[in-house]
Design a protein with these regions (language model features):
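Short, solvent-exposed amphipathic alpha-helices that sit
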Residues: 54-64
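Conserved alpha/beta core of the MobA/IspD/sugar-nucleotide pyrophosphorylase nucleotidyltransferase superfamily
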Residues: 1-40
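Helix-adjacent hinge/juxtasegments
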Residues: 88-124
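C-terminal binding/interaction regions
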Residues: 45-54, 128-168
C-alpha cells in the first residue's frame, strides 16, 4: 500500500459480502473456471441410464428452463451409465458446459464415474441440503441424482437451489 500511496494512487475501502484472495496461478484458474461461472450460465450437460431416463425426461420437459445438451440415453432400454456420464464430463472439460447432471437409480455409479475424471467434482444430490452444500462448500460441477429417491417436485426444488447458490 505504501508504494501505491507513494505513486499517488488513492486507496478506498468499501463493504463487500465476500472476498476471494488469490495467490498462485492455479488458484486464479480455479476461480475463473469454477467460481465465476454459476450453474445455468452455460448449457447444462444431461445424461442418464435406463433407470434415470424418466426423471431426466421430466427435467427437460417440465422443470428445465435452462439451455441443456442431452447426451443420452434416449430410451429406457437397458444400458451402461458410464457411456453417458463420461460424455457429460467431456463437455465440462472442454468448457462447452459448466455443469452436468447425471441420473441413475442410486446416483452412486454416476457419481463414482464422474469423480474419476480430472477436473470434475461430482456430488450425490438427493435433497436440497446436499445440492446447496455441493455448490457452496465443494464447488461441484457435476451432480448425480438418484431416480429412486428424487421425484419431480424434489427435482424442481434441487434445481432451484442450484440456480441460487454460489461457492463461498
Amino acid at each position: 500500500y505504501n508504494l501505491m500511496i507513494r505513486d499517488g494512487l488513492k486507496i478506498t475501502a468499501a463493504n463487500t459480502e465476500k472476498m476471494h484472495v488469490l495467490g498462485a496461478p492455479h488458484q486464479f484458474e480455479f476461480f475463473v473456471k469454477r467460481v465465476i461461472t454459476r450453474f445455468g450460465d452455460k448449457p447444462i450437460a444431461l445424461a442418464s441410464d435406463h433407470s434415470g431416463f424418466d426423471i431426466k425426461k421430466q427435467c427437460k420437459e417440465d422443470t428445465m428452463a435452462l439451455p441443456y445438451i442431452d447426451v443420452g440415453t434416449f430410451t429406457n432400454k437397458s444400458c451402461d451409465y458410464p457411456d453417458y456420464v463420461l460424455q457429460v464430463t467431456k463437455l465440462i472439460q472442454t468448457n462447452e458446459c459448466s455443469h452436468g447432471i447425471s441420473f441413475c437409480r442410486s446416483g452412486q455409479g454416476a457419481n463414482i464415474t464422474a469423480n474419476k475424471v480430472k477436473g470434475i467434482i461430482s456430488a450425490l444430490c438427493f435433497d436440497e441440503y446436499m445440492a446447496q452444500h455441493a455448490i457452496k462448500h465443494n464447488c461441484a460441477n457435476h451432480f448425480s441424482i438418484p431416480s429412486k429417491y428424487v421425484d419431480k417436485a424434489k427435482l424442481e426444488s434441487i434445481l432451484e437451489i442450484m440456480l441460487n447458490t454460489s461457492f463461498d
